[in-house]
Amino acid sequence: RQRQMCIRDSRKKDLIMKIGRNDKCWCGSGKKYKACHMSFDNRIKDYWNRGYEVPDHSMIKTPEQIEGIREAGKKNTMVLDFITPYVKEGVSTGELNRLIEEYTREIGGIPACLGYQGYPKSVCISIDDVVCHGIPSDHQILKSGQILNVDCTTIYNGYFGDASRMFCIGDVSEEKKKLVRVTKECVCLLYT
């Protein structure tokens, strides 16, 4: 892995060095390189020369791409908000999947999970000790005392929004409530 990173990084350095000041920029903006990303790439090259790992150009987004990702995230949040009142005792995870697929399409999105590497459903729903990527089923009925994770990814205008939400079904044990609370606190620490 370390060798692959070195090879990848050296290729990136070569790519940056091969772009002329008046060539079109690598980002696809149509602008000349010197007016677009040249100063940015020079800073990146400086970091690379000092031994830092630097991101591939594909990881660097334009303002338009960032806005597209933001809009996809908003649509994905709409889906999670929509499904919230349906997550209750007696409902099957298969029904939640159907509702999510219908609503995602209704708001102009595409359920990204559906068909991804053969995944058969539009959302991942994990109950209790299923860590992630639980497959919804009409035979899986929500019961009081369970905790549930709905992991949803929405494609909107070619961009992906991805998030999950935890739910407590009915009367949940103190241990499970603590797990959900502490997990949320940990996630919030990432954004402070």
Regions found by a protein language model. Name each.
Residues 9-12:
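Short "domain-exit" segments at the C-terminal end of structured domains
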Residues 14-20:
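Short, flexible, mixed-charge glycine/proline-rich loop motifs
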